[in-house]
Amino acid sequence: MNGAELGKEICDSFKQGCKQAGTDAEITLSVTDLSKTPAIIEALQNMGKVVLKKAEKDSSVCAEFARSATKAENYGGNNDKEGYTNMVDLGHLAQNAEGLIGESKAQIEKALSDAIVYKINGDYRRHASGLSVYYSYDGDQESAARYQQIAAENIYSSFVNYSIGANISDEALSESGVGEVQEV
C-alpha cells in the first residue's frame, strides 16, 4: 500500500465514523501529494503579486479581497464566539476573488488539482477544494506577523498583513515588483 492508498483509507474510514456519529455533512479531509506543494506556493505567491500590484494604485482592493475571503469556505468558526483559526479554503477563495486575481485563479486550481490526490467533503462543505491557507479573519496583526514568520511564501502573507493595516517589508515589495502601496 502506498501513501495515497493509505490516505484514501484514512479518509474513507473517517467518513464512515462521521456518518455513524451523524456529523458527516460537516466533514472535509484530503490526501495531498507533498511533492506538488512548490506549485501551490508559487500560485499563492502569484496571487499575492496580483493583489499587491492592484493595491499599489487602490487600497480598496483589500476590502474586495476580504469580501471574497468572507464568502469562502472557512474552517474553525472564525468568529468571536467560536474563536479564530484564520483558515480559508484556497480553491473557494480563488473562485470568489476571480475578478480580482485574474489568471492566478487558473494557476491555483491547476496546482490544487495536481496536489490533491483524494478528498472527501460533506454537504455543508461542498466548496472544499482540499487545501486551506491562512487569512486573517480576526484582523489580529500579532497573529498575522507570527504566521508570516513561518509562511512558506512571502508575498501573499505580506498582502494579508497589509490588508489589516500592518507594514509590508521592503523585501516583499521588491519581490512583487511593487514600489509602494497606499495606506489602508
Model-identified regions with their sequence ranges:
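Terminal, contiguous helix-loop blocks that mediate binding/assembly
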Residues: 1-184
